[in-house]
Amino acid sequence: MQHRGDIAAWLRLQLTPGVGAVSTRRLLAAFSLPDQIFRQSQSALEAVVSEKQAKALLREPVGFSVALQNLEGWLNQNGQRFVALGDPDYPQSLLQSPDPPLCLYVQCADWQWWQLWAKEKQPPLLGMVGSRKPSPQGERTAQTWAKEITQSGFSVISGLALGVDAAAHKGALQAPAWGMGRSIAVVGTGLDVVYPRQHTQLAQEILNAGGAILSEFPLGTPAIATNFPKRNRIIAGLGLGVVVIEAALQSGSLITARLAMEANREVFALPGSIYSPQSQGCHALIKQGAQLVESAQEVIQALPPQSMLGVNFATNNIAFEADKKKSPEDPLSTVTQKSMLKKEKEKESQTTVLSKGSEKESPLLLALGFAPISLEALLLELSYSAAELQMELLQLELAGKVSRLPGGLYQRLI
């Protein structure tokens, strides 16, 4: 959709204050298209929405002219599109989700590839989400699995956030550029705003490799905490399923998992150590029916057969070794969405992977995780000499932070 009148009407509907998703669907059901909505009288509109909403629809939103001008300038650049409901390039999988966004802002250099999966759902897509502060094992697993999944012909969707999201995108980028399987980022800002800023280069690499970045939010939209759960429903709705890696109980990843379940998508969760705080969400999801998976190939093979068209299974079978803690009975009922959003806000406001409380922790303690690990693996992970490593391990053991296990293994305790 590149007609100025159509774009202007959709943008005006999106920017009209006080008219949310439910009211918008009622209006479109009654009048078909946005330009028809704005031709109605107040009384006709009030038959569908409230008086306040009807009056808002009859007024041009504040800043609309500037927003339209900015959008038109943005669309003049190659590979940038505006796709609204009813457009043939609108992803079919989103149309089949409970709450499809009104419109999408899209950056993609290979529009033929976009059209193929938007219309035919080929290649199939998989979401991958998780902690913004993953353990080294979790981060490696996300990257390795994303690479394997993408090399198998799937595309990987994530949210361009810190931690697991970034690892998933980087793993997908290790597959051949411009192949069938690529990296897709769904963001919670306008597409002219990269958040977090340190992922500006990563976003460009996704585009350079033929992938896509998309958002439902107008240009100029900053990083607002309440926008990220909305972003999560698109990740959940686009793919055949969602893989959750290292999610704490109050993680925003649980919102994505819940939305995926509501959209009748598959949900996969990786088990880990019962001693890791990062395991609570994954273990709770497994208790609620999410599929426990230990390799990327298990994820692919668990998907419906009709999604396998053109997929070339990877032969590698990478076992998962993660860090986790005891999980509660039911995270999605015992933890309210309000508390999840609060936690999401805290995480989105971070500009580094480490929290203030963990900045003083040694690289060794961070690398250990709660899953047993060998001295040899630690030497590969860190730039320590064997003597330095053994000395610091001894100090951590004496401090009660690390336990020495049989077989030359070590495990973090706190």
Question: Which role fits each region the language model picked out?
Answer:
Residues 1-6, 84-414:
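Glycine-biased, small-residue-rich flexible motifs in mid-sequence functional cores and linkers
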Residues 1-89, 399-401, 407-408, 413-414:
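Short, small/acidic-rich helices and loops at N termini and domain boundaries
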